[in-house]
Amino acid sequence: MAKVCIAAYVYGVVQGVGFRYSTQRQALALGVTGYARNCDDGSVEVVAYGEQQAVEQLMEWIKQGGPRGARVDRLLTEPYPATPFETFKIRY
């Protein structure tokens, strides 16, 4: 199956609620690599690389609201240059 890389920008109540760490756990469980980081505007940027189906499952999990305590109001995605990452990290 083809590998894809997606950049996602997640808006809503997504900082201070464990969103990045929960996204990391979900991504690793799906075999997806990349990173999540807080942005200055209150959003979270997620870059996900892996099998298309696994990346789509991660995006669907994010759309559904992510972890308890988070609220996703908007999710924007765009293609990202295919970058094989070693693992899924939290960036600061």
UniProtKB/Swiss-Prot annotation:
Catalytic activity: an acyl phosphate + H2O = a carboxylate + phosphate + H(+)
Signal peptide: none
UniProt feature coiled coil, ranges: none
EC numbers: 3.6.1.7
Broadest EC class assigned to this enzyme: hydrolase
Residue numbers annotated as active site: 20, 38
Domain of life: Bacteria
Family: Belongs to the acylphosphatase family.
Cited HAMAP family: Acylphosphatase_entero
Name the UniProt record assigns to this protein: Acylphosphatase
Organism: Yersinia enterocolitica serotype O:8 / biotype 1B (strain NCTC 13174 / 8081)
